Amino acid sequence: MYDVVVAFPKMKVAVATHGGRVAAIRYLPPASALKAPANALAERAARQLERYREDPDARFDLPLAIEGSAFQKRVWEAMCAIARGRTRTYGELARELGGEARAVGQACGDNRLPIVIPCHRVVAADGVGGFAHATDGYLIEAKRWLLLHEAQADAFALRS
């Protein structure tokens, strides 16, 4: 199912490749097993994820399989425009894109390429908000870690 699984604080990050592209990135529970890269693209993705884990300014250069509705793609493009160390609310993106905050949240949750398409930078108006269609558990801890990693702790008084 996954071509590599990389260790991160609060989670494991799994990558699936297909047809020479990264098809999916998933957050797995922290106790999940690691997996060595199964192919050259998985190796490349693992190296770039590990570099990001150590340096939030690291950039990704991976061929991506991006599939979604026109609105989802607009949301994902807007997420990519959010600079590291910054956040936007679901409502702000909704107003910018001419949609509803709930639809933006749905597009964030449907993002199959998190970290590379940084849905963690989209937050609720009153705090962190959900993550990958979750409102608690390790996925929210993962979002908190990503925001802390990118220096957003002060803005949202995140607690570990």
Question: Language-model features: where?
Answer:
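Acidic/polar active-site rim loop that often engages polyanionic ligands
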Residues: 27-29, 125-128
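Short Lys/Arg-enriched helix C-cap and helix-to-coil transition segments
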Residues: 116-124
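C-terminal flanking helix
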Residues: 112-113
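Residue-level detection of the helix-turn-helix DNA-binding "recognition helix"
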Residues: 109
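…primarily DNA-binding HTH/wHTH and HhH modules…
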Residues: 126-160
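Basic nucleic-acid-binding alpha-helical/helix-turn surface characteristic of O6-alkylguanine DNA
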Residues: 1-99, 150-160
